[in-house]
C-alpha cells in the first residue's frame, strides 16, 4: 500500500464517541470493533499488516483466552511468509478464531479464511474466493535461482498440506485445484471445504 493511500485511509476512518460516567471517549471505528473482538484484515497481506493482525490476536487472547475472536477478511492476498505468520498465530492462541469473507479472499486471503475454526468459517453471499499456487520471480546467478525455486516448491508443498488439513480434501485434489487461478463462489468454496457456511444475515 502506498503512503498516499494509507494517508487517505487514515483520514477517512470514522470516529465513534462513547458516553460513560467518566465522560466522553473517542475511538476510531476499528479500535471500537476490536473491543467487540473483531479484527479486520483488509488489503494486501504484507509484513506490516501481519504484524498488526498478529498483535491484535495476541492482545485479544490476553483479554480473554476463552472467548471467540472474529477475523473479517477482504484481501487480494500477498506475501506467503506474512500470511503464514498470521496463520501460525491463529493456530497458536487459545481462543477459537472465526473467519468471515467480505468482498474477496484471494490467495493468502483464502488460505487464512480456511484456517478459521472448523464450523466457524463463513462468507457473505456475493464475495469472491480464489485459490492458486504461490508464485515468485528471481534474478541473479543460476545457483541462486535454483535455491529460490526449490524454496518456492517447498512452500507450495507446505501450503498444499495445510489446505488439505483444513478442507478435508486430499493433497492431490488440492494440487489440482491450486494449479491455476481458481475463482470460486461462496457455495463452491463451501463444497471444497474452504468455508462452512454462506451467511446472508445475522442469525
Swiss-Prot record:
InterPro entries in the cross-refs: ClpP, ClpP/crotonase-like_dom_sf, ClpP/TepA, ClpP_His_AS, ClpP_Ser_AS
Predominant location: cytoplasm
Compartment list: Cytoplasm
A GO molecular function held by the record: ATPase binding
Catalytic site: 107 (nucleophile), 132
Keywords (A to Z) from UniProt: Cytoplasm, Hydrolase, Protease, Serine protease
CDD domains noted in UniProt: S14_ClpP_2
GO biological processes: protein quality control for misfolded or incompletely synthesized proteins
PROSITE patterns in the record: CLP_PROTEASE_HIS, CLP_PROTEASE_SER
Function: Cleaves peptides in various proteins in a process that requires ATP hydrolysis. Has a chymotrypsin-like activity. Plays a major role in the degradation of misfolded proteins.
The protein's name in its UniProt record: ATP-dependent Clp protease proteolytic subunit
Amino acid at each position: 500500500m502506498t503512503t498516499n493511500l494509507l494517508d487517505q485511509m487514515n483520514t477517512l476512518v470514522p470516529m465513534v464517541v462513547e458516553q460513560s460516567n467518566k465522560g466522553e471517549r473517542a475511538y476510531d471505528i476499528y479500535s471500537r470493533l476490536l473491543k467487540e473482538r473483531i479484527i479486520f484484515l483488509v488489503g494486501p497481506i504484507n509484513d506490516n499488516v501481519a504484524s498488526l493482525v498478529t498483535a491484535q490476536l495476541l492482545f485479544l487472547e490476553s483479554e480473554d483466552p476463552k472467548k471467540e475472536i472474529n477475523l473479517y477478511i477482504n484481501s487480494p492476498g500477498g506475501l506467503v511468509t506474512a500470511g503464514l505468520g498470521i496463520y501460525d498465530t491463529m493456530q497458536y492462541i487459545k481462543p477459537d478464531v472465526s473467519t468471515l469473507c467480505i468482498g474477496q479472499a484471494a490467495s493468502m486471503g483464502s488460505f487464512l479464511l480456511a484456517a478459521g475454526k472448523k464450523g466457524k468459517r463463513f462468507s457473505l453471499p456475493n464475495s469472491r474466493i480464489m485459490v492458486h499456487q504461490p508464485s515468485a520471480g528471481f534474478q541473479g546467478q543460476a545457483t541462486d535461482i535454483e535455491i529460490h525455486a526449490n524454496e518456492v516448491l517447498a512452500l507450495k508443498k507446505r501450503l498444499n498440506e495445510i489446505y488439505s488439513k483444513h478442507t478435508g480434501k486430499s493433497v492431490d485434489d488440492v494440487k489440482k485445484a491450486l494449479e491455476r487461478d481458481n475463482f470460486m463462489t461462496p457455495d463452491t468454496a463451501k463444497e471444497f471445504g474452504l468455508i462452512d457456511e454462506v451467511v446472508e444475515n445475522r442469525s
